[in-house]
């Protein structure tokens, strides 16, 4: 795999999507940001949604509740647009509860064993919300917050900047944490997510986006035929609670191996519970520099998504437990109807000193970037530019 050469340039060609049939009409003259009122919480708080559009016809929608990605509309090789991220229809649907579709999760993405950690000699008790463990920031994590938002736009991108201040002690975490998440849709057909945070006390931070992807289009069926490559030759074995055992194990000779292209479902029957929910250790040569983490191809539509990140790990989740009670446009979702590639630090790092540190101290800045780059795979050739 080839690493990203720079913040705005991909090592692989991106599709000339605006030229495809059905995409040029209505495309913006340049990057644009439009704000809409999306709904209200039961307490009357307004929830807004921002629509980002580039000149090539791609469209991204983000709402302020949970800093949630609600749409990524990408054409297939015939120019037909589809929303490739799983979503719900109304603000009320999200508020009533959902499996974190497209939400920013924090303060700590993934699991912390025993809902506790010790930092600088002080033990902190977090809210247990996964049995006795803590997951995705607790019962009132960032996915249930209405974020402040403002549009950001340049000649090369359309974006929205979302901010939130998490008070000292929220869900048990020390320190007042100031967080900024920026989504930007670029003219190069990249969805760029930037995460920043600062604290006034030592704390742990691990942020990600929990988008579920289906490159055939949300609601179209399962993703087991998607072809996946992960730039990871090791993963973290875990116990039955999905808490890492502490070792970094080779994927070679196991159904965890996606170092070469293979369909997601090709060996899922050999995985415990027939479901991937595992953290992979990315093969990075340059520490936290932006590099390629994953490439996914949906053969029928020709859609390609590449994921670049500064993070050391990525959680692959194949959503076996997705309920058919959850619907979009009246169409029920179901098992394996989406996959997640959650770029992040490792689960339970606060209790594993050998894992990359997630400690953030006053005066330091937490900064990470993840990019999703979209293109079209020609039937007999590389992704078109």
Residue positions per predicted region:
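N-terminal secretory signal peptides that target proteins for export/translocation
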Residues: 1-4
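Bacterial N-terminal signal peptides
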Residues: 8-19
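Cleavable N-terminal signal peptides
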Residues: 13, 22-27
């Amino acid at each position: 795999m080839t690493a990203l050469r720079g913040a705005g340039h991909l090592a692989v060609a991106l599709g000339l999507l605006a030229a495809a049939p059905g995409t040029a009409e209505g495309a913006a003259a340049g990057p644009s940001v439009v704000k809409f009122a999306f709904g209200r919480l039961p307490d009357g708080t307004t929830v807004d949604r921002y629509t980002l559009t580039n000149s090539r016809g791609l469209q991204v929608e983000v709402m302020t509740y949970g800093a949630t990605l609600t749409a990524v509309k990408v054409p297939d090789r015939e120019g037909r647009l589809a929303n490739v991220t799983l979503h719900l229809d109304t603000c009320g649907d999200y508020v009533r509860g959902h499996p974190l579709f497209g939400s920013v999760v924090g303060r700590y993405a993934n699991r912390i064993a025993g809902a506790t950690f010790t930092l600088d000699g002080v033990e902190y008790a977090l809210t247990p919300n996964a049995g006795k463990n803590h997951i995705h920031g607790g019962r009132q994590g960032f996915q249930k917050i209405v974020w402040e938002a403002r549009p950001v736009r340049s000649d090369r991108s359309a974006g929205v900047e979302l901010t939130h201040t998490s008070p000292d002690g929220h869900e048990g975490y020390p320190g007042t944490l100031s967080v900024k998440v920026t989504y930007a849709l670029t003219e190069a057909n990249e969805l760029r997510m930037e995460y920043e945070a600062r604290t006034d006390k030592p704390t742990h931070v691990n942020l990600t986006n929990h988008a579920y992807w289906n490159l055939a289009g949300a609601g179209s069926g399962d993703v087991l035929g998607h072809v996946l490559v992960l730039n990871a030759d090791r993963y973290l074995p875990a116990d039955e609670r999905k808490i890492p055992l502490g070792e970094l194990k080779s994927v070679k000779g196991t159904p965890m191996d996606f170092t070469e292209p293979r369909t997601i479902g090709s060996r899922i029957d050999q995985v415990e519970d027939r479901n991937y929910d595992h953290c992979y250790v990315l093969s990075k040569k340059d520490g936290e520099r932006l590099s390629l983490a994953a490439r996914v191809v949906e053969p029928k539509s020709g859609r390609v998504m590449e994921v670049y990140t500064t993070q050391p790990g990525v959680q692959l989740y194949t959503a076996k437990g997705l309920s058919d009670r959850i619907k979009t446009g009246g169409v029920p979702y179901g098992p394996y109807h989406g996959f997640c590639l959650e770029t992040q630090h490792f689960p339970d790092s606060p209790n594993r000193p050998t894992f990359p540190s997630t400690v953030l101290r006053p005066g330091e800045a937490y900064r990470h970037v993840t990019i999703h780059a979209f293109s079209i795979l020609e039937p007999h050739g590389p992704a078109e530019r």
